[in-house]
Structure formats: structure tokens, C-alpha cells
Amino acid sequence: MKTVMSGLDLRAIANELSRMVGSHCKKCYQPHYEQVVLRLRAKSGGNTDLVLIRGKRIYTSQRDRPMPQYPAPFAMVLRKVLTNARLKAVEQVGFDRVLRFVFENSHGAFHLYVEVFRDGNIILTDGEDMIIQPLTHATYADRTLKKGVQYSPPPAAQDPYDLDFDSFSQLMNSSDRSLGRTLGGVLNLGGGISGAICADTGNDADAEIKNVDLSKVWDSLQGMLHGEWKGYLFSGKDGYEQAWPMVLTT
């Protein structure tokens, strides 16, 4: 199972989940202390569970799952605010591993932020991003997540969609990391996609950037960013192990 999601994974997921815009939230559950399930009903009928696991992943499901007999406090807050609210938008925050789900009801707009990086959180805010309730209260060096304060995402990651070739080359040449680590970390692409770009361009992931033809890396990156995303499962000896928005060559 995929355990780490990159910024590009989240971009693909946001695009896919946009088909659910217009659905209404009918139920909110918290089957596990790190997991929230929103049961969404489409305009055409039929329910789909939106499964949110803080710090890990986001996916949809239609399988039956046991739910707690009594809702946890966070689930109760979600039910109070989001029951019968309409999903208006699914947005990635920059190129970060954060999705914003925009809901609307007769009282106005509400945002549900889902952070899928290490020590991430799930945060319910009003339409002005004032925190109504986080899944867990937390204080970091650069932000605080607690009721009554303004939500602020983590420091913004580099968005590769904002780069042209010149700025890309400058960013790469200023890095003291290897090619693979720069693509995966500085550009927030993750290990799998950065490894695929290295393989596609005939480079070792540990190669020094000064020895790399960056025009080939740029072309491969553009293919990843602007290619057709369908979603692919890759299996190993123990079953399905990874999911990617495109076929990776490694």
C-alpha cells in the first residue's frame, strides 16, 4: 500500500476528486483516531466514502466498514458543521501535501484541510480559515493548530509548475544534493517520481547535478507534470504495493 504521497500525487488526487463536487456530506465518522470518513452522496444518487488519514493518504471507498457506535468528539464537530453541506471545491494548497475541501451550507463556507505529510493534521475552519477544531492540537516552530486561531499551512514547497527552464536550471544548480534528492526533496516530487525521471534520462539518482544534462531532465519533468493521469496499481509478490498517477519507468 502506498504510504507516502508527494505533491504530484496530491495534484492528481485533487483533479480526480473534483468529480465529486456537488455531492452532499451525509455522515461523518472517526473509525480510528487518525482517520476520518466523510460519506458523500452524489447528486445522481449513490454514496461514496471519502477516507482521510492524517499524515498518510486520501482515497475513496465504497466498501462497508465497521464504525464506532458513539462518535468521537472531532467527528461530532464535523457532523454539526458539515452534515448536508455541499462540496464546492477540492483544491491543493500550492504544491504542498495539503488538500482543502470547501463545503457550503446555509451558514456559509467551511474548509476541511487534510495534511498528508509526517505529523500532519486534519483541520476544520470557517470560510476565513479560522480554526473551528483540529483533529489534534499542535504547536510547531512556525505555526499553531488550535481552536480559535488562524489556520496557516506549513512553509510553502517549491511548485514545479511555476518554473520555466531558466529558473529550473538555477534551482537545480544551486542545490548541493544529488540529482535524485533535489528532484524528490527540493521540487517535492517524492522518491518514486524523481527516480523515474532519473531512469528516463539515463542518470543515476546519486549523480552530481553538474554532470547532468538538465535539458533532458526538464523535458522528462514536463512529461510527468503535463502527461495524462489515469491512476495505476503496481503489484509485488504480496499483492498491490504502489499506486501512481502515471506509468513510471524505473
What are these regions (language model features)?
Residues M1-T250:
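Extended, highly charged segments
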